Amino acid sequence: MSVLQVLHYPDERLRKIAAPVKEVNGEIQRIVDDMFETMYAEEGIGLAATQVDVHQQIIVIDISENRDQRLVLINPELLEKSGETGIEEGCLSIPEQRALVPRAEKVKIRALDRDGKPFELETDGLLAICIQHEMDHLIGKLFVDYLSPLKRQRIRQKLEKMAKLNARAN
């Protein structure tokens, strides 16, 4: 397994729409494993393939404290959503920035697992929020898209400043 490079906003590759996975095979499983490795290395709880410049409908999630409840969503479909909630979300592609994002409280999804077996999942709370956040990535949407243009511009400026400082340090 290897750690992949995470794309950072405003990289336009984050806006690409992911294609459905045609066949879950060894190559897809390797991508899934590398995505988990990357997510854990970056201390995240979810990662969409788009964020590592793989434009296929693959999501990995693990919201557990012990990093032992891996969830793989290949070609996820939202079947139902209900209620309203929201938390201050962060994103590995938008480092050190957080914002309140409105989300459905409960979701029901259908997807394929790491072995290509179909399953349905009904959930709420942090897992439901994380699923919605990662599914947004698959259609080129970021949490900053839910913000006002002014807030979005401020975040972009902060990230550009951070990138310049990091470039100088290296």
From Swiss-Prot:
**Cofactor comment in the record?**
Binds 1 Fe(2+) ion.
EC number(s) from the headed UniProt entry: 3.5.1.88
Q: Where does Fe cation bind?
A: 91, 133, 137
Q: What class of enzyme is it?
A: hydrolase
Task: Give the Pfam families listed for this entry.
Answer: Pep_deformylase
SUPFAM superfamilies in the cross-refs: Peptide deformylase (SSF56420)
Please provide the record's keywords in A-Z order.
Answer: Hydrolase, Iron, Metal-binding, Protein biosynthesis
Q: Which cofactor does it need?
A: Fe(2+)
InterPro entries according to UniProt: Peptide_deformylase, Peptide_deformylase_sf
Q: Where is the active site?
A: 134
A single GO molecular-function term is:
peptide deformylase activity
The organism sits in which domain of life?
Bacteria
Catalytic reactions of this protein:
N-terminal N-formyl-L-methionyl-[peptide] + H2O = N-terminal L-methionyl-[peptide] + formate
**Function of the protein:** Removes the formyl group from the N-terminal Met of newly synthesized proteins. Requires at least a dipeptide for an efficient rate of reaction. N-terminal L-methionine is a prerequisite for activity but the enzyme has broad specificity at other positions.
What the entry lists under NCBIfam families is as follows: pept_deformyl (TIGR00079), PRK00150.1-3 (NF001159)
What's this protein's family per the entry? Belongs to the polypeptide deformylase family.
This one is known as Peptide deformylase
Organism whose genome encodes this protein: Yersinia pestis
